[in-house]
Structure formats: structure tokens, C-alpha cells
């Protein structure tokens, strides 16, 4: 069977950026990596209801700058900034360096692969039919402006005895085109029948010369007049 490379990993340095940016060597590298993993796990657990898509970690000169990309910034910030200040104190203690937290709002959650996967998984946990959940998410993404989207669910769908995989796609999802801006992410739905995996690919357009290039249909070539 053909295997697929991770769509984000293959595009790093081309159209995608790393989510952890720092330099270290030897034992320091392992320590930084472990703390990054622990920080992400802590934040994802703490901010479950805040629709967090991505957490970027930068470490400039004995400090840490954490950027939280969320569709619901009000939940992260809290009343008068109390929640985000408590988060900052906890992370400073956990990471052992002064931490600065930035919050970036996601304006179009329908075009974010992680948030779409979370939404489909939550619907599956509420016993919504998987085909309906997939179709609704695909239609919303295409309406907002996606060039293409594919959603795949795997597991005991509808409580079936035998696990299977189903998928739904609209538009183009060119996995081999390295300049294609493809947002990919996964999430798990924990149902009474077991775990159902959700994968989402969203094609937003091609990045040419460092900017987003809108894909427009090519005009048909003019017809040649027949010689008399």
C-alpha cells in the first residue's frame, strides 16, 4: 500500500514554519525539547474549551515567548487578564525562564485543520452521524474560501463491529505540490464504542514568491481560424 509523507513536515522551510524556534546542543537540546512537549500538553489540557489550533514557542536569550493561536481569545485571557497572567506564572515555573505570552485570534476557524478536526470529533462524541458531520465541515470550508478540503474518519463508525475508514473531499488537495499551502491536522473522538481518528487536509492556495497566489481558472486558448 502507498504511504503518505506528513504534509506539514515535507513543506517546512518552503511554505511552512517550525512551531519551535531555538538553538541548542547536547543535553540542552533534549531538555528544551522535553519542556516544549510538556508545555504544549499542559496548555492543550488547560485550554480545552478555547479552540486552540497551534502553540508557537520561541526562546530568545534565556527567555521564552509563547504564541497561542485560538479562535476564542476571551477564554484564554479571562476577566481583566487574570487567566493569562496565571498561565504565565505557571509556565515560568515549569520552564524555568521568564515567559511572555502572546495571543493571536483565528479569524476563520472553518479554514483551520485542527479546529475543523476538533469540531468533527466533538460531533461524533455527541452521536451525530459521521457523514453529516464531514459534509457540514466540508461545505463550511468551501463556502469561506478553501480551494479544496478532505476529511477522513477511521474506527468503529456508527458502532459497527468492524472498524473502517471513510472520507469525503471537495475541490483540489494537491499533496505533491510543495508550494501548495496545505493545512493538515488530526484529532481523536472518544466514543462509547472506542476511539475514532479524524484527519483533515485543507488546501488554501499556492504560495508563489512568498505570497499567497489565488488560483484562477485558466482562460481557454483562442481558436485558430481555418484557412480558406
From Swiss-Prot:
One of its GO terms (molecular function) is structural constituent of ribosome. The keyword Ribonucleoprotein applies. Residues 39-107 form the KH type-2 domain. Keywords: Ribonucleoprotein, Ribosomal protein, RNA-binding, rRNA-binding. GO terms for cellular component: cytosolic small ribosomal subunit. SMART domains: KH. Signal peptide: none annotated. One of its GO terms (biological process) is translation. The keyword Glycoprotein does not apply. Belongs to the universal ribosomal protein uS3 family. Part of the 30S ribosomal subunit. Forms a tight complex with proteins S10 and S14. Binds the lower part of the 30S subunit head. Binds mRNA in the 70S ribosome, positioning it for translation. This is Small ribosomal subunit protein uS3. It comes from Pseudomonas entomophila (strain L48). The lineage of its organism: Bacteria, Pseudomonadati, Pseudomonadota, Gammaproteobacteria, Pseudomonadales. The gene is rpsC.
Amino acid at each position: 500500500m502507498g504511504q503518505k509523507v506528513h504534509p506539514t513536515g515535507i513543506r517546512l522551510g518552503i511554505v511552512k514554519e517550525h512551531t519551535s524556534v531555538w538553538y541548542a546542543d547536547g543535553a540542552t537540546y533534549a531538555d528544551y525539547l522535553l519542556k516544549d512537549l510538556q508545555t504544549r500538553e499542559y496548555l492543550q489540557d488547560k485550554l480545552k474549551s478555547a479552540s486552540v489550533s497551534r502553540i508557537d514557542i520561541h526562546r530568545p536569550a534565556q527567555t521564552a515567548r509563547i504564541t497561542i493561536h485560538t479562535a476564542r481569545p476571551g477564554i484564554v485571557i479571562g476577566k481583566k487578564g487574570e487567566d493569562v497572567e496565571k498561565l504565565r506564572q505557571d509556565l515560568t515555573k515549569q520552564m524555568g525562564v521568564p515567559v511572555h505570552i502572546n495571543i493571536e485570534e483565528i479569524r476563520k476557524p472553518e479554514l483551520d485543520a485542527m479546529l475543523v478536526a476538533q469540531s468533527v470529533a466533538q460531533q461524533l462524541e455527541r452521536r451525530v452521524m459521521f457523514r453529516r458531520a464531514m459534509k457540514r465541515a466540508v461545505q463550511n470550508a468551501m463556502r469561506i474560501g478553501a480551494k479544496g478540503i478532505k476529511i477522513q474518519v477511521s474506527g468503529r463508525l456508527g458502532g459497527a463491529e468492524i472498524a473502517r475508514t471513510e472520507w469525503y473531499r471537495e475541490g483540489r488537495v494537491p499533496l505533491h505540490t510543495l508550494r501548495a499551502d496545505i493545512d493538515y491536522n488530526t484529532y481523536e473522538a472518544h466514543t462509547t464504542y472506542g476511539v475514532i481518528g479524524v484527519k483533515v487536509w485543507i488546501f488554501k492556495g499556492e504560495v508563489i514568491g512568498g505570497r499567497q497566489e489565488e488560483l484562477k481558472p485558466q482562460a481557454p486558448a483562442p481558436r485558430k481560424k481555418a484557412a480558406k
